[in-house]
């Protein structure tokens, strides 16, 4: 989980920076990603597609208008997809309830970005991984 904490740290900062840079078009992309995430949750079985989740986080990175941060996001997502620990976590968190909670977190992040409230965006982004870590506490025991 240490690696997840490190990734969360820079993702929080990306959300904070995106709040200051996001354009109307960026916000539209984030809304579309959340709509996709909602459709995926409504129509898929546990363990279904998470394309909306990925698109939401990508849209936040793109809203910084910083190509290095976008590339950092893409690389970290790829690492996540290939990480045995993350795959194990997802095999245990097949319940869509967790994904629904994460969607609520995403809506809070988006609300802060719409208001261009960098502090609120960072705080909302910080809260989300804490919930994931709590949910996974029983999965990874040292």
Specify the residue positions occupied by each region the protein language model found.
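Conserved amphipathic alpha-helical segments that form helical-bundle/coiled-coil interaction surfaces
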Residues: 3-87, 106-108, 120-132
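C-terminal-biased regions
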Residues: 91, 95-114, 118-142
